[in-house]
Amino acid sequence: MKRTFQPSNTSRKRTHGFRVRMSTKNGRLVIKRRRARGRKRLAVTIAGK
């Protein structure tokens, strides 16, 4: 049986990235909550250049 998690940076960013979060009201609430908690990463970011 195939595993459910097939990692892909593209789809990861498209569904959980910062710009996607900011595009909806609920997404902005997510960012707001994470800021309030003092999270180091507010949304999914791909390490690189």
From Swiss-Prot:
PROSITE patterns: RIBOSOMAL_L34 (PS00784)
An example Gene Ontology molecular-function term: structural constituent of ribosome
Gene Ontology CC entries for this record: ribonucleoprotein complex; ribosome
InterPro entries listed in its UniProt record: Ribosomal_bL34, Ribosomal_bL34_CS
Keywords carried by this UniProt record: Ribonucleoprotein, Ribosomal protein
Gene3D superfamilies: 1.10.287.3980
Keyword Ribosomal protein: yes
Coiled coil: none
Pfam families per the UniProt record, alphabetical: Ribosomal_L34
Annotated GO biological process: translation
Family the entry assigns: Belongs to the bacterial ribosomal protein bL34 family.
Protein name as annotated: Large ribosomal subunit protein bL34
